[in-house]
């Protein structure tokens, strides 16, 4: 008998032999509730009368086009020609001219010339022309210099954050400060990298701004435990809170980072989802401080900012386009960021073209400008209205309080859960807010994310719900089901 006739169990036969950091990592936005929602949706297809609703409302994730947001015409016209350039052979025909304005044709030809083809690899750092346009956009937005060499195109903001955290987290005692409540991507990535998460609280009493005294306390306590805080994540506008960080808090964080040698990672993907005031980037605030205090070592503050085509008025989540830009990063370290990008080969080229259209949209006088502005304004106003409608709905819900968000796509209401519900949940070894969310899903078909998935303190109960769904019917379902749950357990 040959020694190759038998078999030996492989790595997947013993779960304990696999990377335990993967088992530890948790991404609540697409966790157990989302899986249950999919199962219920499948049940509804087979038996439409099995639940007191006809479809699931996926209010657990910021996925605008899934919830009915229309794509921007200019964006899809350019992508159409780039995906199927043979159409350009018909540019002189009437039907073509009715479908594709001249600036769409010009942009498509320019992008095809730069990329070669959407099916071809690009440079790992991204298409040079697109990076130049990103630098121009940042320069115009903030009023301070930005170079194309500081721009790295990515397959979304999540990829951008992962690149930076992969490079910075080198050992288990390397700490990353993350806001609480936090977007769970960061906690999951820290777990995967075997790093240490250091939570700092946002103040619900102060519109979810940074509680700076607690921020410093979190750093000090981590340091006493031997954790070397190397990176701090700031999310502006906030996810899940929808709040904007005040300029005063921005300055405090930048000064603290300078004093303690901490790299800042600014997640600014919701910069076009602001419903009050205007967006102020961390990059701009750093530039203002450097201009105001030229001899105060501001060139020692390393800042990475990320943006994406998934949010804002584009809502192109599935296309996977984004970028990171770096400030005050030494060239040898930038080389290592590029090395990590090279390992991934390149971001999706279609996503890179979307980034170009995000930062370099039609301008006044261009044939596509009027329609582009009309669509962008309509989407922005629709989101503002949907935000207001859902916020007003929370006022009719028992044991709920909610701050009106200033940005992003979410409400983060506080729910004072009845003691009977908490006891029932704990008896079933389920987090109380998750138990509530399951009850809500089964009664209303609305899928939300329990606050425990965002790192909320023990005994503090919230949910995150998007306001991307159109109309008010789902709000009535939400209010009715919530109040039924409260009545049942009070």
Swiss-Prot record:
Keywords noted in UniProt: Aminotransferase, Cytoplasm, Mitochondrion, Pyridoxal phosphate, Transferase
Domain of life (superkingdom): Eukaryota
Cellular compartment(s): Cytoplasm; Mitochondrion
Pathway: Amino-acid degradation; L-alanine degradation via transaminase pathway; pyruvate from L-alanine: step 1/1
One BP term from GO: L-alanine catabolic process
GO molecular function ontology, one term from the record: pyridoxal phosphate binding
Top-level EC class: transferase
Keyword Cytoplasm: yes
Its EC number(s): 2.6.1.2
Keyword Cytoplasm carried by entry: yes
Short name of one Pfam family: Aminotran_1_2
Catalytic activity: L-alanine + 2-oxoglutarate = pyruvate + L-glutamate
GO cellular component terms attached to this protein's record: mitochondrion; nucleus
Modified residues (N6-(pyridoxal phosphate)lysine): 311
Residues the entry annotates as binding pyridoxal 5'-phosphate: 157-158, 183, 239, 308, 320
Named cofactor requirement(s): pyridoxal 5'-phosphate
Primary location: cytoplasm
Function: Alanine aminotransferase involved in both alanine biosynthesis and utilization.
Assembly and interaction partners: Homodimer.
Similarity remark: Belongs to the class-I pyridoxal-phosphate-dependent aminotransferase family. Alanine aminotransferase subfamily.
Full protein name: Putative alanine aminotransferase
Gene for this chain: alt1
